[in-house]
Structure formats: C-alpha cells, structure tokens
Amino acid sequence: FDGEGQITSAIGYVTSEDLPILYTLEGHGEKEMDSTIKEDIEKANMDIQSLNLLTEGSVPDDADCLFIDSPSTDISEDEKTAIIDYLENGGKAMIFSDYTTEDLPNFDAVLENYGVQREAGIVFEGDNQHYAMQMPYYLVPTINSTDASSETVSGGYYVLVPYAQGIKKMDDVRDTVTINSILTTSDQAYSKTDLNSDTLEKEDGDEAGPFDLGVSITETLDD
C-alpha cells in the first residue's frame, strides 16, 4: 500500500481549487497509457481526458498538459499548427516517440520547433553497465538531475528504456529555448538503422553515441 503517495495526493486535492486536466492526444495509433503511469497521474490529482484535435480544432483552454504518446501515423498539418500554437502560448506537453518506418513530418516539425530531432533507428548500448538482462537494447541510462527528474535521482531509482530512439539537439535553436538532458547513454552507445541486420554489434552506417533518450525543453516567453 502506497500510503505516502495516497496522503500526498489527498493533501494536493484539498489544497487545489480545481483539478488539473491532462489531455491525451488520440487518432494516430498512439499507445494506450500505461496503467502505472495512469495511477500515478490520478494520485497527483490530475483529471485525464482524451483529445481528438481533428474534431476539436485546438487544445482546450483548460488544458494543463498535453500528453502525446508515440503516434504510429502522422498528425495533420492543422494538428501540428494547433499543438505549436498551444505550446507557444505557454502550454505544457509530454511527448514520447517509438521507432517506426512511417514518415512523420508534421510530428517531427513540432519537435524541431523546439530544437530536437529523432535519431534514425534504435539505440543499442555498448557498455554492459548501461543495459539490462543481457539485452543491449534494454537501456539503463544515466539520470541527470533536473527539475523534472530530481525526485528520481534523489530516490536512487533506475530507469529502464527498451527499444529507444535517440534525441538529437539541433544546432540552430532560438535563444529563448533551453534544452536539458534528462536521460543519457554512455559514449559507447550506437543507433542501429538496419534492424534486419544479423548482428547486434555496431556496423558501418550506425550512428555513434552518446545519445539523449529524454530531455526537458523550456522556452522563455514574453509577458
């Protein structure tokens, strides 16, 4: 029984006038939210609602956060514009991606608007201290202490990240955007682009690490 978590949740509830709302984007083959994550969000007293931007047209004004979990098909041009408009007006988002052979130019454009790109392929780890169960694609990255990860670091927890894509920080980023690394591989990691290969070892054409697997991005907006 997670007594401490439940108590914290109760305190947050009675001290908050309104229940924060997290909208989960749907309509593009997104993953269903993991039950453990859903429980944690609900314990933090956040209301979870689904969002179809094709029918709604924009992110609702009462959104406290937009959750985009690994779309397998691309968002539309209008959805891309709606998401960027929401973020550029102070909105918050949690965005995840999985490896896919599908082109996702509009989804990628949202990421690139904030200075990051998805690496091609899946990241493998060459340092056996940074992967689990003897599988070099079950990554155990270094957790860097940021506002988003300080509790995980201070608690001494590990994060397991299987079948991950690397995140590339772009060179040309506007001055108002700050990108901080949360999860990073060792410098022996590599991203395999040929997933039909007969070997898990690094080959010609594989991108050399280290890689970010998770980042936090903030932008300073004019008042």
Region annotations inferred by a language model:
Residues F1-D223:
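Short, surface-exposed patches at the edges or C-terminal ends of soluble domains, predominantly
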